[in-house]
Amino acid sequence: PADKAGDAVRFDHVSLTYAGAGAPSLTDISFTAKRGQTIGVIGGTGSGKSSLINLIPRFYDATEGTVEILGRPAQEYPRAALRGSVAVVMQKAQLFGGTIRSSLLWGNKNAADADLWAALETAQAADFVRAKPLGLDEPVEQGGRNLSGGQKQRLTIARALVGKPEILILDDSASALDYATDAALRKALAALPGDLTVFIVSQRAASLQHADQIIVLDDGRMVGLGRHADLLKTCPVYEEIYASQFKKGDAQK
């Protein structure tokens, strides 16, 4: 058997049907993400992307099959313990009123300023924070109303990194970033020391071109698993997504 110590996330014939729903949201999903890998998740609206990643921090439990996190069945973890190891950054950035510093300290209240700046650098937020008159002490309005969409997204990614998770899930959370910032963020995450495993859920194929594996979902089923170049040859659904974006000019590097 494979060495489970090297596995960050393993799905073994996983299906998920939400309570009260007639049809399953996920059907028979199997894959293994090794520690340190970047995993892309792509598919059309309603394909099951959020359902898949919701199983990793145990927002829900699989109806069938097994989900293993860091070598153990997900159900063996108390949810609170799992949330320390798995950080999820949603598309809609949630920020509370206070300052940039207090916003980041939600990730880890004992973090030193050096840790905050390191997280801001990785999240491509350090430059805009430095440009603020008060830096880390700059006020943040409730919901981050005084920040742009891209600034809010970068701050919530930095906040997640301050918690030093083992698994980071970006659920379409770079959607407000331009391509250059998005690419710089992915490069910085890949360069982090240690074995951080990153799941990037994206509508943009261009954001996933350098992922170690890409999971392609269609109607709750996995219709492709592999690297970008291979999927273009073997997975019609992926090829179609990429071609439609490439025509529109969305698939810039």
Predicted segment positions?
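ABC-type nucleotide-binding domain
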Residues: 2-253
